[in-house]
Amino acid sequence: MPSLLFTCFLVQLLIHLVNTFGAATINNLLWNLYNMLPTPTSQSAGEQKKLKREYMKVRQEMNATSSQDEFAKWAKLRRQHDKLYDQLEKSKSSLDSTKSTFDTSVSTLRWLGTNGLRMLLQFWFSKQAMFWLPKGWFPYYAEWLLSFPRAPLGSISIQAWTLACAAVILLVSDALVAVVALVLGARTGVQGQKAKKMEEPMKAGGQGTEKAGKKEL
């Protein structure tokens, strides 16, 4: 059953990615992508971004204006600031309600497509052998554990295969993270050495100038 083997591996990989990046991060990414499409909330999201830019611009200008020396200008900016703030809060409240519903729907679909699908596969194919072990290579208790709970004795059950996939994915993920950290650390070290080499001639030149000045004195 190569297709079932690959399906189990893919589901476990998706679960690992969700756990690694976090559900909130994925929800925010999907929400931003959703608002880029011609959806009912895309216009509201665009207006909110526009209001936010105007609000920040007015706020910066108001903070840069003295309320004592330029009171008339400051008061006008203050009224604009308060008006934009109220509009921004109303827009944010409306979008937050929609986003909450969106997050709930996405979280439900994500669970059904990952953990729910994994549980369904493990239940539906619990009596089916993923593949068979070479006869006589493993003791009875090992064959029993690998076929647990309901697969034929001497075979690999879907539960055992799922655990093996999870272990391999975790090991590969940790190895990739370690390699990336090592490469970034090596680059940082090389850049630090280059910076030190550039500083040494500058220090030497500065010391030479100081000595020359002392001799002249």
UniProtKB/Swiss-Prot annotation:
Keywords: Coiled coil, Endoplasmic reticulum, Membrane, Transmembrane, Transmembrane helix, Transport. Residues 195-217 are annotated as: Disordered. Residues 25-110, 173-217 are cytoplasmic. The chain crosses the membrane at residues 5-24, 111-131, 156-172. Residues 43-97 form a coiled coil. It is found in: Endoplasmic reticulum membrane. This is Protein get1. It comes from Sclerotinia sclerotiorum (strain ATCC 18683 / 1980 / Ss-1) (White mold).
